[in-house]
């Protein structure tokens, strides 16, 4: 595996003097009102200082005994249960989990999408208003746009990497973003859509959250900076697992969606897997799809009863995700600086044709970047976004604004080159391979 990065002027221009104190990353975008009596989000930031994956004996996980190629539903249920354990009991204040610790990525509080103070939710893609004659992405009852918000967290192996990336709070190091085996990332996604728009969300998990206040008649959910306490409902849960058996990418992604028509004593028993994905099916283009080919590096649950639009040509995606992308495709754009568009180029959302999307659906090994000039953050957008949020804040604070790199234009990201022969040893059990301005990280 190789990992391409740039150690040139573009990235180094972001260097700033140290001012902040380790372990004191902000919790939320907005201050807590003095009269607030509800929950208050606290960032879980006591990151492990020792890599749990290197413990003796080596840690084991319940899903490691299950082959996701042949038993995807069993595999992801084992991960789902692992994430639920101890978190439901503390209402997802993951720092208080008595079973195992979980951690939040720093610097997701910044900007107009930043973490709100009640639950730590950040603003996700809004679900657009359906066009005349089309069914809404959230179902046939959807007639208006809906804003969606989410909170993500990682288990101890992932938390260790967060701590390494942010060990110096004034100089976060994206080179440290390479997750060990057993890392699990999870995200709860909520929608502000009302029950008359999404009736299948009856009896789901409901939270109050300080989210954007929309103006009357706003059909596109364009938002300003004003926020207010509103009801949000759990619609989707995303999971990502670092698993070396996923030889295509190093990662297994999965999505659950809520179905109020299912039985069960609690909302978690009505969460249904949409599918499991370990590769991007790079040969599945429009011509192949039209000829009858379908995804082979994903499993899509045949027993879905709630509205699902899936991703490009049937690849895995969740109900609030963009239908022109996929779980893996979206996350493989995680890089610093962000030069690659998070979505493939398109004239407009489907059914209009997507223009040359296939560079976004290659199988990229863990730790690489789509653009050779950037540093990949191993499929983790919260690390890449957090670092760039921090850099923008520091530039504004210090009165310095560097030119921001534009996303890659034209046909798509650059191809990933092979590493050169030079190989000075690194101190992290890997090899750094120097090739001009680029440096590749290669597994021994």
Protein language model regions, located:
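Conserved small-residue
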Residues: 22-329, 334-338, 344-444
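Bacterial N-terminal signal peptides that target proteins for export
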Residues: 1-8
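N-terminus-biased targeting/localization segments
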Residues: 5, 20-21
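Bacterial N-terminal signal peptides
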Residues: 8-17
